[in-house]
Structure formats: C-alpha cells, structure tokens
Amino acid sequence: MPLGTERRLGHARLWHRRPVADGPRPPVLLVHGGYHGAWCWDYWAERLAAAGREVAALDLRGHGGLPQPPGYAETGVMGFVEDVVAGLDALDRPAVVVGHSLGCLLVPLAAMQRPTAGLLLACPSPPGNLPGAQKVRLVPEGAPVPPLPAEIARSRYAIHLSDTELADLAAKLCPESPRLLNERYDLRIPVDPAAIGAPILVVEGGRDDPERHPTGQDAAIARFYDGDHIRLDDAPHDLMLGPGSDRWFDAVWARMDGLLGAA
C-alpha cells in the first residue's frame, strides 16, 4: 500500500502519512477486517490525505502480505486487538479509528484500552453480547482458512465489481485465523460500551451479506454503542472499493465529521 512511511509493529505493520502542516483534526487509523489488508483502504486513505488529514492504515499480523507468525491459526480476537493498540500507540494523539467488518470487533476492544477521538464502524461484526445477535456457522480449526474463491468473495463482499476488479480483489485476499473467525461467529467476545468514551458512527451497507449482516443488526449495533447510524442503500460490504466508493466515502465522512463536531 503506497501510503507514506512503513513501520513494523511487532508482527503487524503501519502505513502512515502526515500532512504538510498539522491541523486541528485528529488522525485517522484504518483497520481492515478478515482476509483483507491495509490495501482495501487505498482509496479512503488517499481521500483523507488529500483533505489534509493525518492518516494511517494497519496490516494486522499475517495480512497484507505479512508472514503468518507462529501460532497464527490459534490467534483469537484479543491477539489481533494487540495490533490495533500498537497502531494507536504509534500515533501522537488520539485517533478516529475506522474499522471494517471483523475489524469492527477489534476496534472497540482497543478503544477500551486507549483513548480515541471517535469510532467509525463500517459493515460491522457484532459484539458477542449484542442482544439478538445471530451466530454464524463455525469453520474448522487447526490450520488457517484459505482465502475465499472469487465467486464467494463476490457474493459476500463485492457484488458491484466487474470480473476484472473481482479477480484483483480475490488475488489480494489472505488466509485467515480460524480462531479469530470462530470467536466472532460464535459470539464469544463481549464489549463494554460504557468503557468507550468517544462518539461512534455505524455504517450499514444495504447490499451487505445477509447471513453475517441480517436486517436490523447494524442498527442494533449502533443502539448498543449509543452511537449514530447511517444506511447506504446501494452499498455492498466492501464499500471502500470500486464503483460508488466516492459517493459512499462522501456520505460517511460528512456524517462522521458532523458527529465529531458535535462531540
């Protein structure tokens, strides 16, 4: 991901770009979800940097081309939360932390450990203690889960992409920790919303995967966090990519900046 400087944070990696002149707005830390890497934020990172914001994007351990460390298949949610905390610690001041999908379970848990300026949760995985949350079928453990084939990636992530764009996306996906997936799918990891002292925006994609994001769940997540909620009717799960991403970015950040201004 061609975003400023590269810095290793243990088994993770941070891509970081500072503005020419520091401004009053907090930095933004971008955290990807399962199978993805910092590359999925390329467009958002460029837009944020062009607006004069300090922006950083995280490659979690074993993602974005990083080697899988020992015990990767047995690494659960809290192991990956350590990477997010390290990313926050690498910045000079509290950040707006943006999570996508499974990253939206990691981000609030990190925000329970470090001060943040705000949380933006896009197409979020639910906390384990969300009332009414639906479990998802578990995956076999013992070895990393292979990257999703292109057609499954299309239906789950990116029904809006062309065949060429989809092939590029599928080629970048990486093996995932089954422990991480199962702790999310089995709703094993609770979050304490009272321990997060920052405004929160939950973004719902109207064309998201209904198995993992059933109708009403994203709005329920917003209520759980006492946060704001925006639904983008035509947005898929990977709303950071492909046709429409410019409109979705504008809508999301107009709402997020308004929320931060009111905080």
Residue ranges and their predicted role:
Residues 65-95:
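Active-site loop/oxyanion-hole signature of alpha/beta-hydrolase fold enzymes
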Residues 196, 202-204:
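Short beta-strand/loop motif that positions the catalytic acidic residue
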Residues 47-69:
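Conserved alpha/beta-hydrolase
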Residues 25, 33-37, 206-207:
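Active-site glycine-rich loops that stabilize anionic/oxyanionic intermediates
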Residues 206-235:
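Conserved loop-alpha-helix segment in the C-terminal half of the alpha/beta-hydrolase fold
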